[in-house]
UniProtKB/Swiss-Prot annotation:
The keyword Transmembrane applies. Pfam families: MMPL, Sterol-sensing. The gene is disp1. It is a multi-pass membrane protein. Interacts with SHH; via the cholesterol anchor of the dually lipid-modified SHH (ShhNp). The chain crosses the membrane at residues 173-193, 482-502, 507-527, 531-551, 586-606, 620-640, 701-721, 970-990, 992-1012, 1022-1042, 1065-1085, 1089-1109. It comes from Danio rerio. Its main location: membrane. Signal peptide: none annotated. This is Protein dispatched homolog 1.
Length: 1464
């Protein structure tokens, strides 16, 4: 008992955190002080303590730091301790080491003051443990390096890396350097070599290429461009072309320009000294509405519009340089309602009008409205030269025609519903909108006026408000907004950085991850422009940044989690092995998510729209490049951080500093932050491991019905009513800003409300039918470059000069005029069918003049080929000389080449269809006309058999391409997602459920967008097609986790997948949701739409995957091999590393996988069939929890599916490879079973001098060995239990409530404690945690170091013992010889209801998938039974029961029988 005075009991907290406290005095520890110490323990490592360091390859090295403060008294204490324990404390004695998790550092000290840690030697057992989730634990504290330590290991010789993992582990700086060089080179080449993108025309690339209509439109446009003087085609013969070009080159103006000049000459207001011109489409304009929704026809509103004109437009400094003027002194007045009232009432300005003038003008408008609406009042009714009414409008009152003011008010300034014929004279007029025309040309010159006086200023004065603006700068302003609004993606990136930093607890890893994401865009731009040679870079490519931020963060979270799983599974492994295992699993998981999303983007390549195809290639490439960086750059960053940078930002302080009261503000702040983060992580753990599985499973029927109803509702909204609408705005009015922007409101709302806009945009014009022969409708340009439209391809078989062709064309024109879809004009159109005009001209020519012959009436139709070729040239030239009509590039008729040969002809008729944006009407028009023409061409002669027609079908083709391309892209995305899911899980049922979940997600998402008013335009098409790639990720993660779950039943698999993947999936969804939310304030429509879409798809896909998919798996999920694709036997259990393969030969037959038949969860709501056993006593619950809390394991080996072959006493079990028993929930060692723990223990004893022995706080654990006592403590988390070959019982009197999610204090224990010679030669593999020994032994060793006799393990308070049954067991049971060591799997150890510890037999079962176990019914040897258990407990290492704190939820026994809800 010499040491008992200096030592207190060695303790292991019930939550899995071991501690041993050895105060120098018997002064009790204050509970409150101890509680405070437990919170900050993790941040208080002793700087004198010899710590473990990570070597070059991740190996652990013992590092001893010298301390200048070491005193002689401390050395004396150490020497005295060595004298007291000459055999029990060899040089390899283990002392406390800093922990990864929130352990109590002060509890870890073996000798707080009496025996300083500087005098102790750190053994190899002091290896830092690894937690389970980054969300629930702290990243820097998970790493193998210890705080404030320096690596002093000797330099190792150069070793060339054998594989990629060793390259990452040994040469992370080299890998990072190579990646950095490549990124910099790609950036420089991508920026310097090709031209920078030009976003001045955002509509560029929005036209379809490659469609039948698209090829015709491209060919027609090329034909128009190549028609003219010295061009490929000409309207005139070449001999006359030069003369005609010279005489008409000054007249080749556009029709609008000509008409405008003509109107300017006709309507010259300069004599009236008021208006300079008439309002028109070329002038800047503003739309006003009442601020309170009232009538604008009142004097306050009219004067308010005049004030806006003076203060916002005319007062700008640049206005004087831009306005039109009659004199140098002043600018022309604006065309406003007030100025027109002033003209009609002879007032000088708008400010001079009165209420009487307004009423008088209204009366004039009332009396003249009917003349305007019936078409009799037109712009030509006033002769400005004579200042009198024109004779054409003699029946109209003069007041209606004076100055054409009434016509211009109705046509330009008021909305079309004002004073319409439907309103009677007795109803008050209702003017909703009025327009103001400024005497400035719209365009770039108006940019400064808009930016200074309109963009950020209030648009209302309380009376009127500016609702729409048309300055002609929409696309120019878009380019500026596109760059300035990148601040919102930047804000999103910053917020994602904060979330990642909190999640990983490492600023270095966070910044390097974001650098990898940005680098992905740079490298993909290089590949896009230089390697793929794409010349066109649409503005939509910029939105790839937002999507990539979410995906990159998801990959970082996955790698973080997998890294910690690997370190937890193999804490003693070298760094290269950790990297290898991490990449094996993380690379696959990241590849699944990256490939499915990239495939969804690449699927857009099937679209016919150039911008969508380019965006799909760029975004898909960026995601794949990001994946490559995530498996090269990011692992190297993690290794570099772990080896060198983990200690830079630590907030830990040594115990000496803490005791001296030298804690700084930052240390206190860091502790507070750590406590808050720990509380958050605890809440997260409870939610994802307890609450969420409970909610999902208990309410599964409700969730299924609810989400099925949502799916049906979404499908109804998308497909039936109101369904996804095609775009309703022309391409020229394509929306680029948010809907509330005044530029967009003018195009979308107000343009159709004013008559001059309706007429100019062709809503009252007939659709033309243009038919072409002689040119092949082929788009020979680059479909990925909207600027490259190719060259004109002529039809070599074309021949119009043959008599048969002449007759057929004439008959064709006559048939076409008789069709119902052709508009019959009253005026004779001599240009529609040139053959009719030519025949008539020939018949009217007199043959008396010899020079005319043969082009005269003597020649009969059809004409000879030579006559036709000669006379058609004369007819065209005569037509040009005798009429003022000029033939332009779009005029129907023949087209000549440079040799005067007719190479093409054009016919054009007007149809009865009016231009409309409605898809159905345009579709009917195209199908009807094209079908009739193709039917007629079947009987055409050989020279005219390849004709085709075209019309104003650009918008219809865009609509058609969007509707078809979106569906095809989504279908391809679904096929790829299903394929990837199938290859990942090898299970058809899981893959089918995932696709059903994705379908529901798509329907609900698109339905929500429809209800939000979305139309299927270009941007919407891209976002919707990408929905499949973004929504499949969550279902894939859950599906893979379901298949890898070791539990045999559905409920266990669902709980496993939810608890393991729930946190990472939620974080991925959160980061992407935040990135989308930050885009909402943007002005650019592409950003706001993408933000809306990301928020919706993340919420809906997470909900469907978590509740709908998991409930389907719980209800009808596959069990065993149901739905599994059969694989070759060699592949079923061959998933192993090279190191594992080398160990299999020594362990026995490879290929046998282990599982168990029953499992229990310690979560009451998850009980499928709860057995009502009445009220269990506290002792029962404590005993069951003690059994679970005292199980520990070695994680030094990744034991595979193999039955271990030893010379004697071999146990073999063969079951299916897909199920595993007693597996740690977060370990990657999916083939490891609890029965392997004994063999692991034997190998560990042979390999190390310090053996793990997990202990809880209430236990006193010592296992009697021949020469050594294994007392080194395991650092596993209490909620992540592990295996052991030792049975330990803990007395209920010492149980304390554990703090959840704590791990054992790493390294706190004793190393190779030599025992006196009273020991027996036998070894016991089953021992009680509170041992009892002979009195002599008790006197020679401390109370807590009592060693059990091989035959008994008793509690100090009882005489009950746990013995091995020496008798012959029943059939199928195993006889144990206690005098010889046996290899006893832990999962075969059971307790009877009377407390006896028995060993169950584990029979070899070949055809079945479970292990049969029987409870030994022999009576206990002990005369006094220790009633520790009253029911059998078969606890699996990976069950939920092991992951809970003992006091959180009471233990409930759950019937583990297979669910009756079976699919197979």
């Amino acid at each position: 008992m010499a040491l008992s005075e200096d030592f207190t009991e060695l303790q292991t907290l019930s939550n899995g955190r071991s501690s041993s406290i050895f105060p120098t005095t018997n002064t009790p520890v204050d509970p409150e002080e101890e509680e405070e110490q437990s919170v900050s323990a993790c941040t208080q490592p002793n700087e004198h303590t010899q710590m473990m360091q990570t070597g070059q390859n991740g190996g652990l090295k013992s590092t001893r730091l010298s301390s200048s403060s070491s005193s002689s008294s401390q050395l004396t204490d150490a020497q005295r301790l060595a004298v007291l324990l000459p055999n029990a404390l060899p040089p390899g004695f283990c002392v406390c080491c800093s922990l990864c998790c929130n352990g109590n550092q002060q509890d870890c000290a073996l000798f707080q003051s009496a025996v300083p840690s500087a005098a102790l030697h750190m053994g190899s057992c002091c290896v830092q443990g690894v937690p389970c989730f980054c969300m629930q634990h702290h990243w820097p504290e998970h790493l193998q390096n210890q705080p404030n330590m320096a690596t002093l290991s000797p330099p190792r010789p150069f070793r060339f890396p054998k594989n990629y993992a060793e390259l990452i582990a040994d040469w992370p700086v080299v890998v990072l350097g190579i990646c950095t060089v490549l990124i910099v080179v790609c950036a420089l080449v991508g920026i310097l070599v090709p031209d920078l993108p030009d976003f001045s025309n955002p509509l560029q690339g929005f036209e379809p290429r490659g469609t039948a209509i698209g090829q015709r439109l491209v060919t027609w446009n090329n034909m128009v461009k190549n028609t003219g003087y010295k061009a490929t085609l000409a309207n005139y013969p070449f001999k006359y072309a030069d003369e005609q070009a010279k005489s008409h080159q000054d007249d080749r103006w556009s029709k609008d320009h000509y008409d405008r000049k003509k109107r300017q000459a006709e309507w010259d207001f300069s004599k009236d000294s008021f208006f300079c011109d008439v309002p028109g489409d070329s002038y800047s304009r503003i739309v006003f509405a009442s601020a309170e929704g009232k009538n604008l026809w009142n004097i306050q509103a009219i004067k308010s519009m005049c004030n806006f004109d003076n203060t916002r437009v005319r007062s700008h400094p640049q206005y004087l340089d831009l306005c039109q003027r009659t004199t140098a002194a002043s600018c022309c007045p604006s065309w406003t309602l007030g100025n027109y009232i002033a003209v009609l009432t002879n007032k000088s300005s708008c400010q001079k009008i009165t209420e009487r003038d307004v009423s008088h003008t209204l009366n004039i408008l009332r009396s003249c409205a009917k003349f305007y609406h019936n078409g009799t009042l037109g712009p030509e009714c006033w002769d400005m030269t004579t200042r009198k009414k024109d004779l054409k409008c003699g029946n109209l009152p003069r007041k209606c025609t004076k100055y054409n003011a009434v016509y211009q008010i109705f046509h330009f300034l008021v909305d079309k519903d004002f004073l319409n014929p439907k309103n009677t004279d007795y109803l008050p007029p209702n003017l909703k909108y009025s327009m103001l025309f400024a005497p400035t040309e719209k365009g770039e010159t108006m940019m400064n006026i808009y930016l200074d006086n309109f963009e950020n200023r209030n648009s209302s004065d309380g009376i009127t408000t500016i609702t729409g603006i048309e300055f002609g700068i929409k696309h120019s302003l878009f380019q500026d907004y596109l760059l300035t609004d990148t601040m919102y993606p930047a804000i999103a990136i910053v917020i994602v950085l904060v979330v990642m930093c909190v999640y990983t607890r490492s600023m270095f890893i966070t910044l390097m991850t974001m650098f990898a994401i940005i680098s992905s865009l740079i490298v993909s731009y290089f590949l896009y422009r230089v390697v793929f040679n794409f010349d066109f870079f649409p503005f939509m490519n910029l939105t790839a940044l937002i999507i990539l931020v979410g995906i990159g963060a998801d990959d970082a979270f996955v790698l973080c989690d997998v890294w910690n799983y690997t370190k937890f599974d193999k804490p003693n492994s070298e760094l290269s092995e950790t990297v290898s295992i991490t990449l094996q699993h993380a690379a696959l998981s990241m590849f699944v998510t990256s490939f499915t999303t990239a495939a969804a983007f690449y699927a857009n390549y099937v679209s016919n729209i150039t911008a969508i195809r380019c965006f799909g290639v760029y975004a898909g490439t960026a995601i794949l490049v990001n994946y490559i960086l995530m498996v090269t750059w990011l692992p190297a960053v993690v290794v570099l951080h772990e080896r060198y940078l983990v200690n830079l930002l630590t907030c830990s302080r040594t115990q000496n500093h803490q005791s001296q009261g030298a804690a700084t503000f930052w240390t206190s702040l860091c502790q507070v932050v750590n406590k808050c983060l720990f509380s958050i992580s605890e809440a997260s753990r409870i939610f994802f491991e307890k609450v969420l599985p409970c909610v999902v499973i208990k309410l599964r029927y409700l969730w299924l019905l609810w989400f099925l109803a949502l799916t049906v509702g979404g499908a109804y909204v998308v497909c039936v009513n109101p369904k996804m609408k095609l775009p309703s705005l022309e391409l020229s009015e394509f929306q680029v800003f948010r809907s509330s922007h005044p530029f967009e409101r003018y195009d979308a709302e107000y343009k159709k409300l004013f008559m001059f806009e309706r007429v100019n945009h062709g809503e009252d014009l007939h659709m033309p039918i243009t038919i072409i022969w002689g040119v092949t409708p082929i788009d020979s340009g680059d479909p990925l470059n909207p600027k490259n439209k190719g060259k004109l391809t002529l039809d070599t078989t074309f021949n119009i000069a043959s008599p048969a062709s002449q007759v057929w064309i004439l008959n064709f024109c006559q048939k076409l005029r008789n069709q119902s879809f052709v508009y019959q004009s009253e005026e004779q159109d001599f240009t529609s069918c040139f053959m009719e005009t030519f025949k008539q001209w020939m018949e009217n020519q007199d043959c008396e003049e010899a020079s005319v012959y043969p082009c005269c009436s003597q020649s009969t139709f059809p004409y000879r080929q030579d006559v036709f070729e000669l006379c058609i040239k004369r007819a065209i030239m005569e037509l040009d000389r005798s009429t003022i009509y000029h033939l332009d590039s779009k005029t129907p008729g023949p087209r000549f080449d440079i040799n005067d040969t007719i190479r093409a002809i054009v016919l054009e008729f007007q149809s009865t269809y009016h231009f409309t944006l409605a898809y159905e009407k345009m579709h009917q028009f195209y199908r009807e006309v094209d079908t009739w023409i193709q039917e007629e061409l079947r009987d055409a002669p050989e020279g005219l058999s390849y004709g085709w027609f075209v019309s104003n079908l650009e918008f219809y083709d865009l609509q058609d391409s969007l509707s078809d391309g979106t569906l095809i892209a989504m279908a391809l995305s679904v096929v790829v997602a299903f394929s990837v899911m199938l290859l990942t899980t090898w299970n058809i049922i899981i893959s089918l459920y995932a696709i059903i979940s994705i379908a529901g997600t798509i329907f609900v998402t698109v339905g929500s967008l429809v209800l939000l008013g979305w139309e299927l335009n270009v941007l919407e098409s891209v976002t919707i097609s990408v929905a499949v790639g973004l929504s499949v990720d969550f279902a894939v993660h859950y599906g893979v986790a379901y298949r890898l779950a070791p539990e045999p039943d559905r409920e266990g698999k669902v709980v496993f997948s939810l608890s393991r993947m729930g946190s990472a999936i939620a974080m991925a969804a959160l980061t992407t949701f935040v990135a989308g939310a930050m885009m909402m304030p943007s002005t650019v429509l592409a950003y706001t739409q993408l933000g809306t879409f990301l928020m919706l798809i993340m919420c809906i896909s997470w909900a469907f995957a978590t509740f709908f998919f998991q409930c389907m798996c719980r209800l009808l999920g596959p069990q065993g091999t149901c739905g599994q694709i059969p694989l070759p036997k060699k592949l079923q259990c061959a998933e192993r590393t090279s190191e594992n393969q080398s160990t299999v030969n020594n362990q026995g037959k490879a290929g046998a996988c282990y599982t168990t038949k029953h499992e229990h969860y310690e979560l009451e709501p998850l009980a499928a069939n709860v057995r009502n056993e009445g009220k269990a006593s506290d002792e029962e619950q404590e005993a069951c929890t003690q059994l679970q809390n005292n199980i520990t394991s070695l994680h030094d080996d990744a034991t595979l599916c193999a039955s271990h072959e030893e010379p004697k006493h071999e146990f073999e079990n063969g079951v299916q490879a897909t199920e595993h028993s007693h597996l740690h929930q977060y370990a990657f060692n999916t083939r490891c079973t609890c029965e392997n723990s004994m063999h692991q223990y034997i190998r560990e004893r042979q390999r190390t001098a310090c053996h793990p022995c997990g202990q809880s706080r209430e236990t006193q654990c010592a296992t009697k060995q021949s020469n050594h006592l294994p007392v080194c403590l395991n650092r596993d988390m209490i909620h992540a239990p592990t295996n052991s070959g030792h049975f330990q019982h803990c007395t209920p009197s010492q149980i304390s409530r554990p703090a959840a999610h704590r791990c054992f204090s790493g390294g706190c224990g004793m190393h190779a404690v030599h025992i006196s010679q009273q020991q027996t030669e036998t070894e016991s593999y089953i021992s009680a945690c509170v041992p009892s020994s002979s009195p002599q032994e008790s006197q020679n060793r401390p109370a807590h170091l009592q060693f059990p006799d091989v035959q008994r393990c008793s509690s100090p308070d009882t005489t009950g013992v746990c013995t091995l049954n020496h008798d012959t067991q029943n059939a199928g049971e195993l006889a144990i010889n206690s005098q010889s060591p046996q290899k006893i799997p832990w999962n075969h150890l059971k307790t009877k209801a009377n407390g006896t510890c028995v060993l169950q037999d584990c029979r070899e079962v070949v055809p079945e998938d479970s292990i049969g176990c029987r409870v030994d019914k022999e009576k206990t040897v002990s005369p006094k039974k220790f009633n520790c258990f009253k029911k059998n407990v078969n606890a699996k290492c990976n069950s939920v029961e092991f992951h809970k704190t003992r006091t959180s939820v009471p233990t409930i026994a759950i019937n583990s029988k297979a669910s009756s809800e079976s699919l197979c």
